[in-house]
């Protein structure tokens, strides 16, 4: 089954019913139901939802916002390739959750791939995507997709955008990524 074809991913609006969403993480569920729309309105973050195309129910979500990563927090091999600014621009994947009814089917990877493509296509300089894994299982999930731990940071991982795109789509130019290639990011 092609998981990506079963869902449309779109920005969160007031039309999305969040009341029944249950991921198994009380803090993520509470955030999604009570805070996500306020953060989006305040432009603190942008929230995207995966909506089941048959039932129109929300099956997952993620948030993106801007952040900076101190240059000396990056692995030395990465840091030496960058300008010697105090920090490099990054996108923070703040939250990612999948409803229990859809867990284990690959939707988390599809959401991650969508976040990477949206970040790469943004018309601003972003070197990497950064995530703060909430636990060891989340850390392993991100590591499967190429994220690496930042030295000295507990569960903060990063993935250079160009690396993600090159590995999944065969190009580091997001404008050249086809919809089919975009679905492969996160697989």
What spans do the regions from the language model cover?
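Active-site/acyl-donor-binding loops of N-acyltransferases
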Residues: 148, 153-164
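Conserved acyl-donor/pantetheine-binding loop and adjacent beta-alpha core of acyl/acetyltransferases
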Residues: 61-95
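Intrinsically disordered, low-complexity and often Lys/Arg-enriched segments
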Residues: 1-6, 168-187
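Conserved beta-hairpin
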Residues: 43-66, 76
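Conserved acetyl-CoA pyrophosphate-binding loop and the N-cap/start of the following alpha-helix
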Residues: 102-114
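Conserved beta-strand-loop-alpha-helix junction that forms the acyl-donor binding cleft
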Residues: 99, 120, 126-139, 158-162
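Conserved active-site alpha-helix within GNAT-family acetyltransferase domains
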Residues: 109, 117, 125-126, 133-152
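Short amphipathic alpha-helix that is part of the acyltransferase structural core
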Residues: 1-38, 42
């Amino acid at each position: 089954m092609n998981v990506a074809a079963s869902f449309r991913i779109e920005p969160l609006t007031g039309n999305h019913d969040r009341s029944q969403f249950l991921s198994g993480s009380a803090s993520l569920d509470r955030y999604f139901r009570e805070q996500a729309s306020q953060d989006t309105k305040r432009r603190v973050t942008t929230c995207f939802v995966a909506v089941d195309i048959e039932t129109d129910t929300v099956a997952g979500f993620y948030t993106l916002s801007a952040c900076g990563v101190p240059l000396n927090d990056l692995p030395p091999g990465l840091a030496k390739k960058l300008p010697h600014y105090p920090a490099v621009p990054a996108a923070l994947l703040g939250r990612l959750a999948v409803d229990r009814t859809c867990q284990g089917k690959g939707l988390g990877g599809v959401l991650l791939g969508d976040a990477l493509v949206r970040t790469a296509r943004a018309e601003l300089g972003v070197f990497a995507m950064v995530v703060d894994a909430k636990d060891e299982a989340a850390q392993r999930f991100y590591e499967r997709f190429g994220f690496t731990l930042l030295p000295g940071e507990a569960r903060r991982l990063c993935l250079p955008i160009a690396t993600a795109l090159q590995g999944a789509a065969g190009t580091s130019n997001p404008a050249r990524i086809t919809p089919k290639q975009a679905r492969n990011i996160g697989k």
